[in-house]
C-alpha cells in the first residue's frame, strides 16, 4: 500500500542511514514484464473455464476467483508503472489531485488482490474439506447457486473493505487489520487441516475409497497455499516492521528488501496458473487448446 509506505518514508530513510544494509533496487522493467505475464496467464485461466462447459463446476469457479485476485495484483503494478511514466514525462502534476485519486484506485486493486486471495484460498479449503469428508453429499451442499452467492458476498466484502482500507491507510488500526487478515486465514485453513487429519485417522478406510481426484485437489490446495505464504509473507512482515519499529536499524535492514518482497507478490500471479495446469489434466488440456487456437466449445 503506497500510502502506508509514504507515511513512513522519512523515518525509514533515517533508519537506513544507521544501517549497513543498502537498499535493493530492481529495474521497473522486471516488475512490468512479470505483471504482463501474470495478467495474460490468469486471463487464459478465466477464458478456459468460462469457454469449456466441462470446467464450469464450483471448484473451478473458486479457482477463477483466485485467478482474478492474482490478475488484480498484476494489474496494480502495470497501472502504477504507467502512472510513474506519465509523471516522469511531465503529463501529471506530482502530488496533484488526479495522481492522488489514481493512487487511491490503484492501491485499492492491491488490497483487493490480497483480500481476494485470502478468501479464495479459504473457500477452496472449505470446498476440499467437504469433498473429502462429505463426498456423497457434496453436490447437494456445494451447488452452483450457492457458489455464486458465496463468491458474490466475498467480492462485495473485499471491495468495500479494500476501499475503506485505502481511505484510512494512514491509521495504525488499518495497518493492523490489513496484516491480521493474513494470519487469520492461515489459522482458519490450519484448523481445517488439523480437523481433516484427525478425521482421516478415524476414517482411514473411508478415505481410501474416495476418488483420487478428491485427494489430488487437497494436495493442489496445499501447494497453492504454500506458494501464497512464500510470496506474500515477506511483504506483510515488511508492513508490520514499518508500523512498529520503523527507526530500528535491524528492521530497516529487512525493509531494504522492499522491492524484492514486491517482486515475490508479482511472481505469485505467474506461478499459480502453472500449478493449475500441472495438477489438473482438464485445465491443462483446455490451456493447450486455447494456446493452439483449437475449437473446443
From Swiss-Prot:
Lipidation (S-palmitoyl cysteine): 293
Main localization, broad class: membrane
SMART domains the UniProt entry points to: 7TM_GPCR_Srsx (SM01381)
Record annotation: effect of changing residue 245 to S: Significantly reduced ACTH binding
Pfam families in UniProt: 7tm_1 (PF00001)
Effect upon mutating residue 251 to S: Significantly reduced ACTH binding
Tissue: Melanocytes and corticoadrenal tissue.
Post-translational modification: Ubiquitinated by MGRN1 that may be involved in post-endocytic trafficking and/or degradation of internalized receptor.
Localization, UniProt: Cell membrane
Extracellular side: 1-23, 80-104, 169-180, 245-256
Subunit (UniProt): Homodimer. Interacts with corticotropin (ACTH). Interacts with MRAP; this interaction targets MC2R to the plasma membrane. Interacts with MRAP2; competing with MRAP for binding to MC2R and impairing the binding of corticotropin (ACTH).
Protein name in the entry: Adrenocorticotropic hormone receptor
Organism of this sequence: Homo sapiens
Amino acid at each position: 500500500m503506497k500510502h502506508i509506505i509514504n507515511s513512513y518514508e522519512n523515518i525509514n530513510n533515517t533508519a537506513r542511514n544507521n544501517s549497513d544494509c543498502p537498499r535493493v533496487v530492481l529495474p521497473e522493467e522486471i516488475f512490468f514484464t512479470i505483471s504482463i505475464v501474470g495478467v495474460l496467464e490468469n486471463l487464459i485461466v478465466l477464458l478456459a473455464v468460462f469457454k469449456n462447459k466441462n470446467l464450469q463446476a464450483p471448484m473451478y469457479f473458486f479457482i477463477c476467483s483466485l485467478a482474478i485476485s492474482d490478475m488484480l495484483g498484476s494489474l496494480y503494478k502495470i497501472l502504477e508503472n504507467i502512472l510513474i511514466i506519465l509523471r516522469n514525462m511531465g503529463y501529471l502534476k506530482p502530488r496533484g489531485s488526479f495522481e492522488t485519486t489514481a493512487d487511491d484506485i490503484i492501491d485499492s486493486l492491491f488490497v483487493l488482490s490480497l483480500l481476494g486471495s485470502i478468501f479464495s484460498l479459504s473457500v477452496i479449503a472449505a470446498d476440499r474439506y467437504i469433498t473429502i469428508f462429505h463426498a456423497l453429499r457434496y453436490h447437494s451442499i456445494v451447488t452452483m447457486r450457492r457458489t455464486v452467492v458465496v463468491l458474490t458476498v466475498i467480492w462485495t466484502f473485499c471491495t468495500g473493505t479494500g476501499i475503506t482500507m485505502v481511505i484510512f491507510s494512514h491509521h495504525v488500526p488499518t495497518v493492523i487489520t490489513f496484516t491480521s487478515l493474513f494470519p487469520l486465514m492461515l489459522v482458519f485453513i490450519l484448523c481445517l487441516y488439523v480437523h481433516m487429519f484427525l478425521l482421516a485417522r478415524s476414517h482411514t478406510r473411508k478415505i481410501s475409497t474416495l476418488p483420487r481426484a478428491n485427494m489430488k485437489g487437497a494436495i493442489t490446495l496445499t501447494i497453492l497455499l504454500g506458494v501464497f505464504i512464500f510470496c506474500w509473507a515477506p511483504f506483510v512482515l515488511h508492513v508490520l516492521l514499518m508500523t512498529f519499529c520503523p527507526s530500528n536499524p535491524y528492521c530497516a535492514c529487512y525493509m531494504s528488501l522492499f522491492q524484492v518482497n514486491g517482486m515475490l507478490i508479482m511472481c505469485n500471479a505467474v506461478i499459480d496458473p502453472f500449478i493449475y495446469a500441472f495438477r489438473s489434466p482438464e485445465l491443462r488440456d483446455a490451456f493447450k487448446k486455447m494456446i493452439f487456437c483449437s475449437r473446443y466449445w
